[in-house]
Amino acid sequence: MALAKRIIPCLDVDNGRVVKGVKFENIRDAGDPVEIARRYDEQGADEITFLDITASVDGRDTTLHTVERMASQVFIPLTVGGGVRTVQDIRNLLNAGADKVSINTAAVFNPEFVGEAAQHFGSQCIVVAIDAKKVSGPGETPRWEIFTHGGRKPTGLDAVEWAMKMEGLGAGEILLTSMDQDGMKNGFDLGVTRAISDALGIPVIASGGVGNLQHLADGVIEGHASAVLAASIFHFGEYTVPEAKAYMAARGIVVR
């Protein structure tokens, strides 16, 4: 029996509001995170991902409070990321009601943190978020590099090798965002999605670039992803989660 593929709406939260940008810039307001999360829960989303994009020191308490509110009203798994740097940060988020915690920049600066987190809390609740950008030119062997700081800083790290290293350290899941595609609405970068999905034994969540339901199906069929994440197509009412599930099921994808 094939494992069901998950559909995960993503909430990018800035100072307690859901926002959506294009290529990590040009932010527009999409509403209250708890209300939006509740709507997705009612629609039958498999999980919710909540990324705190302020992640400033003053924004921390707001985030924990929002996570507490969300966890008390939403009964599907909740992954929270943004500014997670210490074991205590993870503990605080899990105590607030998160089911999984996503680590991004901190993993690049201190890979052992991922191993430490997995040992403390178990791989099942540690997600490593990877922001990848294509760095190879036409005619070259495809290569993607890891970027940090919202896609602004190159690291020199090869995305596929890095994902394998994270799995080895104990990550339970990879959240893969294509920086080239983010907010562009012309589909996932299927090359990097497939390369990483095929190289790993843990689930890969495809993110960045969904503009229609075909893109979600492509992420699974061509990108070999275990789950697909989208924001703006759901937030602004273009499509609903049930429509997405029906579309994928009609293409032979097992959904919950």
Swiss-Prot record:
Q: What is its EC number?
A: 4.3.2.10
Any one GO CC term of this protein is: cytoplasm
Subcellular localization, as worded in the UniProt entry: Cytoplasm
Q: Which residues does UniProt mark as catalytic?
A: 12, 131
Function as written in the Swiss-Prot or TrEMBL entry? IGPS catalyzes the conversion of PRFAR and glutamine to IGP, AICAR and glutamate. The HisF subunit catalyzes the cyclization activity that produces IGP and AICAR from PRFAR using the ammonia provided by the HisH subunit.
Subunit: Heterodimer of HisH and HisF.
Report the family membership: Belongs to the HisA/HisF family.
Q: What is this protein called?
A: Imidazole glycerol phosphate synthase subunit HisF
